Amino acid sequence: MKFQKLKGTRDYYFQDSNKLEIIRNAFFTSAKKFNFSFLETPIIENVELFKRTSGDFSDLVKKELYSFEDKSKRQIALRPEGTAPALRAIVENNLLQKHNKFFYFGPMFRYENPQKGRQRQFFSGGIEWLEKQSPFTNIEIIFFAKNFLDTLKIDDYEIVINWIGHPEQRKNYLDHLKNYLNQFENQLEEISKERLKNNALRILDDKIESQKAFVKNAPKIHDFLPKESLENFYQLQDLFKKFDIKFKVDPFLVRGLDYYSDFVFEFVSTNQNLGAQKTLLGGGVYSSLLKELGGENIEGIGFGFGLERIMEVIDLNNFKDDAKKITAFASNEDDLIALLKLRNNFGDLIKIDCINKVVNFKKIFKSKQIKESDFLIFKELNNAQNEVSLKNKFNDQKLVVDLINPNIENIKKYIKENSD
């Protein structure tokens, strides 16, 4: 029987696996640069963790959660996002005693309709910085995100920001928003009619609803927030300008999870390859999330990104591997053993692909493996010395390499000089 992958999943190979590795490495490099510590959490968690952090009425919990009952009658969920598991691990293991900046990367799961840049199993990365928030911590996260995308040579995006206040400050606004949207309930999509009862904010940045005139004319949250809250937002905008970071304020940007407070942001692609789903990464501040999970009453800020969406916009031509392909082969077992020893002695200094069987010299030069190589290492026929030839396949320039004491610097120099 021939099996196929499940709907909403994908296999990564060749170009896709190269892109995965490039994005992951770029993210890890940026995280280390900004002094974030890697945190790995289990793929499975208690369902209640996500209900507590995302809200019982969130789309994530109501519609997208992969959950099941295990043999011990526990309600288990495949993690749909990384913030809640990361904060759970921080609290459970008392990690704040040693550090307060963490990052994660791995597979997540959401039961939703697969589309370009969105899968049911997907790779996601993110960061969490637990510290009292200020415009300077906010802008530092923007620096991190920009550095990450710059490393990937992605520059066709815009930074969209908003200020949504604390949950208590939003109550009055939510009442006005619901009253306003109730007038247009018959014009809302079915999912938005449900949101209107318990999660009206989500209607504002829904990709379909946000295009409707009555949604564009909805009350704006800034008209309902206290002056001192907005002053922080204005100060943050001034910092953006002082650092010459272009941005756009979108009063309807709210992000998809209920725990956000004050500053929220998205890096939105202007690349036409992405279709409707254009957010490359997004995040914001949360004020009481750590306390909700039994930790200290400390604010935090973070962002998350989906690997699949970024894969759609990076260009592999910007990440060409300049390493030359070197293939070693032998016509007898003794020579093969000598070549394998030579290859192992080089370690990571020089990459050599060794054909692990005795070959016929006349036939091997016609093989695909040799045709795709830049340099060849082999022992010349009838050569009784402890030496092999390193040969440029294109110009016939040759370097004799001593098998007993190979001069690695000479080999590297030869490869460099004969690589043009």
UniProtKB/Swiss-Prot annotation:
One of its GO terms (biological process) is histidyl-tRNA aminoacylation. This is Histidine--tRNA ligase. Belongs to the class-II aminoacyl-tRNA synthetase family. The keyword Iron does not apply. Pfam families: tRNA-synt_His. It comes from Mycoplasmopsis pulmonis (strain UAB CTIP) (Mycoplasma pulmonis). Homodimer. One of its GO terms (molecular function) is ATP binding. Keywords: Aminoacyl-tRNA synthetase, ATP-binding, Cytoplasm, Ligase, Nucleotide-binding, Protein biosynthesis. Its EC number is 6.1.1.21. It catalyses: tRNA(His) + L-histidine + ATP = L-histidyl-tRNA(His) + AMP + diphosphate + H(+). GO terms for cellular component: cytoplasm. Gene3D superfamilies: Bira Bifunctional Protein, Domain 2. HAMAP family: His_tRNA_synth. Its main location: cytoplasm. It is found in: Cytoplasm. CDD domains: HisRS-like_core (cd00773).
